[in-house]
Amino acid sequence: PDYIDTKYHTAVCGRASINLDTFMASGEHVCELYARHAVSADVCIVEGMMGMFDGYDRSKGSSAEIAKVLHLPVVLVVNAKSAAYSLAAMIKGYMDFDPQVEVAGVIFNQVGGDRHEEMLREICEDLNILCFGCLRKYDVLKEESRHLGLDFSRKGKGSITKTMMKELEHQLDIELLLEMTRRSVNIPDKPERRK
């Protein structure tokens, strides 16, 4: 579980953020918790930790397992710094690695400029996967970390958060992301047991 990120989510969204964890809790509990909080939400976003398939035993307890338990589509956030078409091989690997995990699209970050963005969007076209946006490099958006998490002690967080939100609104296809969330998601009463 990550208690620092949930505090940040709560501060930005104005709504409590929770941990979903199949290492410390059963899949059934994760489904119940998600369903309980989803009832009163317009949109539910589940942030993964580490790499998508990184768990305590191969992919057990991973973000991919959470996506499978909850039957959620995955949006990959890919660091595109100093890379272009080679990322196609990596993204294709994520798409094909586990057929039970639906990789619905990609958000690229650390994008260098217009030409770099063009090259990254070509990857999505060639792989027939949605590109939800390309986030540019901005020094103003760099957050200092403290104990592996965001530093809440600095003053002026509100202006940084507003800058982040403006950039995200400009560089992400919010409508396309929201369209994906409108799909009917059937949260199973009892997820399949881990093997």
Enumerate the predicted regions with their spans:
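ATP-dependent carboxylate-amine ligase catalytic core
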Residues: P1-L70, V78-E102, D114-E118
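Short hydrophobic alpha-helical runs that function as membrane-insertion/retention elements
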Residues: V74-V77, F132-C134
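Conserved beta-strand segments of the P-loop GTPase G domain that flank and frequently precede/overlap
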Residues: L76-N79, I107-N109
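Internal gly/pro-rich beta-alpha loop/helix module
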Residues: Y85-R194
